[in-house]
């Protein structure tokens, strides 16, 4: 058996060097381990009995650790009446150690102030409750002041909280658990994670600045708040929520307005967001001494302690925080909607830019984007000045130079656009004329594939128009979906559908059984009725049955819900009257999904002539010359002459000028060359006479026997003129009478 001070052994070393630290060594046989009483930062805590050399027994606390790090080293350097006393170390089983300290009979301050014993303590001791508050606050401040200013090395506790302050049998506060503490050899130390969320300072949460003694000052303010309110700080919030409230929103613990000014100011000075603005422990200790010496303030604080304002103020703060959370959630959702709209807008703009690089073949269909890209391409060959090209592009958009305007531009117009160099204007005018000439030359000569496509489109439209009656009746149905997220939050969206008034109203010749075939586009606009501002981006969708606005809208029913929805229905080209229908409704309740309105609409349809055929003048396509030197695919609806259309149609279908295909014409010619009988019976009562084809012998002279007879019988000037002549005016073959004909070998 040995005393705590007589026997010393080497048990640990510092983290930064090989310097060996000596701790009082207590024999394991002298220690009897008792019940488990708590958990420290890096080990479990047990009660126990220590047999002293004189045979007496002492109740102790044993903290079991795996490695002797900073805690034992720090405890061996400090000794103060308000800091737990360190006795030494004891070797446990294996490589474990026991840190032996004094035992606090009343447990932690946290357990005491939240127990029934705390409620009866003031009355049983004969004093007032605020006297106890000031006494405990002074004792804790005295211990922290010793660590900061009077110890061998400046020590930052870093985990000061009511659970790390214990009470002995005389209800004296003692600071314990130095597992996360650090020596402060300079003005600050590097930040590292340690502590408990509700008691942590902003700089420890963010780990953005070096830690100073001001970190413990923040935690001390929270402990003082616990003693006064007897409430758990940030009780209903998660650690992440606490970190966000402190660092991002700057929300500190609630202090009732009825709190006396000196006490309120003391806690506020501990919770400054900037560490250097906080009070130090010496200033806090002095303020507590002045507070205890002012009886008037003490009476005022005692009266305040009897009120229930803490709970009321905490509940009020919770409501404000919840409202702030909902506002942040709304803002987040709005930002997501805006981000989605921005991405959609960027996607559309990119599509416009891509479309500008591939303009339609019809120059009259060009937009400012197509014109701008075309002009930039042409001018880019003669000028490499980007600023110049940007100015010209801006002028094109400012003056709305579309394809139709581009074809009619002059050199003066180009100069007005900012093309001041003569060479650039000449080159641009040359390309504009070439563009116009190409457009004009190809105006009536579309490709066969394009002409066929246009004719088929027109044929389909005419057939569809002829299949419906002149007038039809449909019903437009506007409604809304509602989803209940929780007691107060709702999500909703609107929809539009259509149907025939009655099943008997469906046109008999209609191929489509759906009334939505008469609707082209449906647009939704949702506005706040109170502010008249849009809640989300207006959305349009092509009708293919039932349509809805794409995004869900989230609102809180606690607010005054008053939403205006505008549904605009645009009809297909086949509908002549009305061209569109608008449904406006105001929604004041979001309890359930429902139909807002059923609007009956009478539609008048366009009809086409039944005698219309494909040969009706149809639009054709004129390719456009592009500065890149190739033709683009596109459509331009113009009209060509019937002769040209007939020629292109025959060429497309493979027919010749006789109205026959090449195959039919070849077959007929073959039949004519083949000998056949004079008569061929096709039917019993029908006889077709086919003349017998005989091959006549070709004559080599025009004064043959047959010719002479013919000329004798018909000696007219016309017959003489019909005689065959060769070049030079003489007969093809002319032999003298009596001479033999020439022989051909």
Curated annotation (Swiss-Prot):
One of the record's GO cellular component terms: nucleus
Compartments it resides in: Cytoplasm; Nucleus
EC number(s) reported in the record: 2.7.11.25
Phenotype caused by lack of the gene: Impaired ribotoxic stress response, leading to reduced lifespan. Abolished phosphorylation of MAP kinase p38 pmk-1 in response to anisomycin treatment.
Coiled-coil region list: 307-352
SUPFAM superfamilies: Protein kinase-like (PK-like), SAM/Pointed domain
A molecular function (GO) term: MAP kinase kinase kinase activity
Family: Belongs to the protein kinase superfamily. STE Ser/Thr protein kinase family. MAP kinase kinase kinase subfamily.
Annotated protein name in UniProt: Mitogen-activated protein kinase kinase kinase zak-1
């Amino acid at each position: 058996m040995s005393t705590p001070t007589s026997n010393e052994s080497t048990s640990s070393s510092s983290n930064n060097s090989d310097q060996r630290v000596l701790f009082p060594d207590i024999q394991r046989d002298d220690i009897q381990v008792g019940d488990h009483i708590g958990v420290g930062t890096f080990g479990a805590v047990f009660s126990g009995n220590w047999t002293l050399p004189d045979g007496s027994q002492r109740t102790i606390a044993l903290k079991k650790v795996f490695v002797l790090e900073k805690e034992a080293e720090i405890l061996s350097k400090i000794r103060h009446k308000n800091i737990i006393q360190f006795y030494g170390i004891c070797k446990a089983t294996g490589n474990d150690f026991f840190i032996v300290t004094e035992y606090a009979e009343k447990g932690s301050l946290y357990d005491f102030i939240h127990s029934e014993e705390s409620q009866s303590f003031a009355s049983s001791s004969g004093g007032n409750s605020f006297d106890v508050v000031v006494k405990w606050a002074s004792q804790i401040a005295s211990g922290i002041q010793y660590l900061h200013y009077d110890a061998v090395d400046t020590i930052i506790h870093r985990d000061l909280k009511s659970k790390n302050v214990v009470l002995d049998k005389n209800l004296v506060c003692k600071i314990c658990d130095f597992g996360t503490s650090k020596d402060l050899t300079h003005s600050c130390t590097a930040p590292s994670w340690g502590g408990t969320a509700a008691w942590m300072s902003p700089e420890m949460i963010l780990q953005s600045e070096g830690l100073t003694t001001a970190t413990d000052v923040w935690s001390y303010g929270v402990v003082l708040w616990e003693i006064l309110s007897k409430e758990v700080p940030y009780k209903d919030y998660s650690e992440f929520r606490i970190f966000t409230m402190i660092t991002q929103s700057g929300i500190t613990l609630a202090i009732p307005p009825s709190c006396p000014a000196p006490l309120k100011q003391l806690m506020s000075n501990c919770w400054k967001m900037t560490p250097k603005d906080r009070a130090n422990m010496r200033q806090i200790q002095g303020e507590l001494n002045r507070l205890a010496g002012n009886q008037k303030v003490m009476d005022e604080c005692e009266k305040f302690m009897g009120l229930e304002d803490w709970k009321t103020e905490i509940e009020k703060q919770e409501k404000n925080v919840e409202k702030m959370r909902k506002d942040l959630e709304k803002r987040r959702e709005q930002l997501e909607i805006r981000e989605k709209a921005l991405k959609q807008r960027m996607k559309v703009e990119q599509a416009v830019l891509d479309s500008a690089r591939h303009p339609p073949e019809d120059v009259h269909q060009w937009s400012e984007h197509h014109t701008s890209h075309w002009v930039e391409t042409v001018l880019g060959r003669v000028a490499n000045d980007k600023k110049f090209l940007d100015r010209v592009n801006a002028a094109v958009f400012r003056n709305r130079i579309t394809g139709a305007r581009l074809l009619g531009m002059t050199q003066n117009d180009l100069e007005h656009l900012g093309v001041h160099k003569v060479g650039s204007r000449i080159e641009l005018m040359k390309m504009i004329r070439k563009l116009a000439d190409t457009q004009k030359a190809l105006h009536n000569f579309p490709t066969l594939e394009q002409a066929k496509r246009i004719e088929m489109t027109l044929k389909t439209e005419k057939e569809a128009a002829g299949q419906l009656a002149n007038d039809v009746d449909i019903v437009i149905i506007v409604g809304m979906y509602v989803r209940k997220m929780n007691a107060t939050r709702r999500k909703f969206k609107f929809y539009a559908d259509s149907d025939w008034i009655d099943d008997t109203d469906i046109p008999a010749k209609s191929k489509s059984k759906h009334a939505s075939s008469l609707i082209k586009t449906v647009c939704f606009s949702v506005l706040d009725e109170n502010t008249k501002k849009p809640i989300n981006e207006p959305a349009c969708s092509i009708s293919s049955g039932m349509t809805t606005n794409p995004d869900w809208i989230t609102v809180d029913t606690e607010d005054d819900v008053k939403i205006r929805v505008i549904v605009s229905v645009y009809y297909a080209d086949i509908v002549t009257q009305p061209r569109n229908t608008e449904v406006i409704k105001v929604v004041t309740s979001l309890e359930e999904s429902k139909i807002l309105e059923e609007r009956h609409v009478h539609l008048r349809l366009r009809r086409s002539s039944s005698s219309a055929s494909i040969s009706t003048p149809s639009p054709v396509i004129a390719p456009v010359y592009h500065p890149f030197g190739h033709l683009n695919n596109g459509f331009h609806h113009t009209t060509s002459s019937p002769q040209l259309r007939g020629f292109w149609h025959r060429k497309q279908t493979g027919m010749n000028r006789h109205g026959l295909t090449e195959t039919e014409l070849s077959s007929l010619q073959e039949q004519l060359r083949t000998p056949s009988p004079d008569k061929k019976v096709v039917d019993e009562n029908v006889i077709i006479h086919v003349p017998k084809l005989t091959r006549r012998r070709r004559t080599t002279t025009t004064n043959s026997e047959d010719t002479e007879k013919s000329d004798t019988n018909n000696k007219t000037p016309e017959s003489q003129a019909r005689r065959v002549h060769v070049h030079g005016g003489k007969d093809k073959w002319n032999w003298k009478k009596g001479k033999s004909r020439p022989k051909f070998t």
